Amino acid sequence: MYHFFIKPEQAAAHEVAIIGSDVNHIKNVLRMKVGEQICVNDGSHEYLCSIAQLDAEEVTAKIEQVSETTSELPSRIVLFQGLPKADKMETIIQKCVELGVHEIVPVQMKRCVVKLDCKKEEAKRKRWQAISESAAKQAGRGLIPDIHPLMTYKEALLYASDKEHILVPFEHAENMQAPRDVLSAVKPGEQVAIFIGPEGGFEDEEIAQAENCGAQAITLGRRILRTETAGMAVLAMLGYVLEE
């Protein structure tokens, strides 16, 4: 069944209104007809609907069943990703959305090779947001994770400062028991910030700055993970702990 997102104000007592690019997708790409069923989510409720009317700029669907969204992790997770090379960011966004991340913040770190210019930055962000939406639909998410504009490392640490847990996977972190202890300490309703370095990793100064903000450097094991793998690994472990 096809999955679509709306804002809460687009849901009435007995019907929902779908607007924007999804209208064209429903009508001209999927070629759906009146009476066909779709799944619609407003971030907290999931609606089983049947298409009632197809207009030029709006699709109206009759609500047949309402249930609480159950696909979201009970803790809000924000991934701060050091800007990687090539198209790796697209893979990171797609897979981390599937694994339950709520926000992704691209971060310019000292060892980042890629430098986004101002003209390309917004176009990139829009593409990344579209990838997030597509992955959220595929995964049956209850919301579309936000892809933030590029931040400096200082800005990222400031944004993360109010989170209950700030985790920094680091290949030189000691105490192999730490990840289990730290992840098990995360409780439903708490917010978690995860910082992932770019291909070259973190500089020691960046780790020190993060620790000064309350972050805990953790190891992900005896093997060094690629930047596009590390965030997924932490999310998978967090998901296991939170949904156990």
Where are these regions (language model features)?
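N-terminal positively charged helical leader segments and presequences
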Residues: 1-68
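Residue-level signal for inorganic ion chemistry
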Residues: 35, 96, 132, 210, ...
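Generic structural signal for residues in well-ordered beta-strands
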Residues: 61, 144-148, 217
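Short, hinge-like loop/turn segments at secondary-structure boundaries
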Residues: 121-125, 185, 236-237
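Structured adenosyl-cofactor binding patch, chiefly the S-adenosyl-L-methionine
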Residues: 203-244
